[in-house]
Swiss-Prot record:
HAMAP family: UPF0251. It comes from Syntrophobacter fumaroxidans (strain DSM 10017 / MPOB). This is UPF0251 protein Sfum_2819. Belongs to the UPF0251 family. PANTHER family: PTHR37478, UPF0251 PROTEIN TK0562.
């Protein structure tokens, strides 16, 4: 059974969700789907010019995972350009537009949001506990007790 995907933060909405080659006649060309997290990876790496480590941190994934996402996205874009295919953007497991980050205290289960551009909190504002995690999903997911990206491993 494959490991579940970690939640990914997507901060930029694509201005268009579909592209088709100009000058095509006849039946519609085959379509390649670029997921929202692949779009975000290309936006951060190629449009904003961020290094993979910083871009991975913004998306809430490891650098290695970011490298795989951006590599897959670039391969799809190259295929679209070389073969003259249509491109659509959507789906892919991102958490949607997230101008803020959600945090949860593992001690008291208190949840709160902080702006994305601020540093991670040092302690819980409710109980002053330091056992925190950042959840890329909505606060509803965090409040339900389901951790989208638990960073600690349970001792066996």
């Amino acid at each position: 059974m494959p490991r579940p995907k970690c939640c990914r933060t997507i901060t930029g909405e694509p201005p268009c969700r579909a592209f088709t080659p100009a000058g095509t006649t006849g039946p519609a060309p085959s379509r390649v789907v670029l997921s929202e997290d692949e779009f975000e990876a290309v936006r951060l790496a190629d449009f904003e010019g961020l290094y993979q480590e910083e871009a991975a941190e913004r998306m809430g994934v490891s650098r290695q995972t970011f490298g795989r996402i951006v590599g897959a996205a670039r391969a799809k874009i190259a295929r679209v350009l070389v073969e003259g295919l249509a491109l659509s953007i959507g789906g892919g497991g991102g958490t949607g537009i997230a101008p803020s980050r959600s945090y949860m205290c593992r001690l008291c289960r208190h949840t709160w949001d902080m702006p994305s551009e601020t540093d991670s909190p040092a302690e819980c504002p409710a109980c002053r506990g330091r056992n925190l995690f950042r959840c890329g999903a909505s606060l509803e997911t965090a409040a339900s007790g389901r951790e989208c990206c638990p960073r600690e491993r349970k001792a066996t």
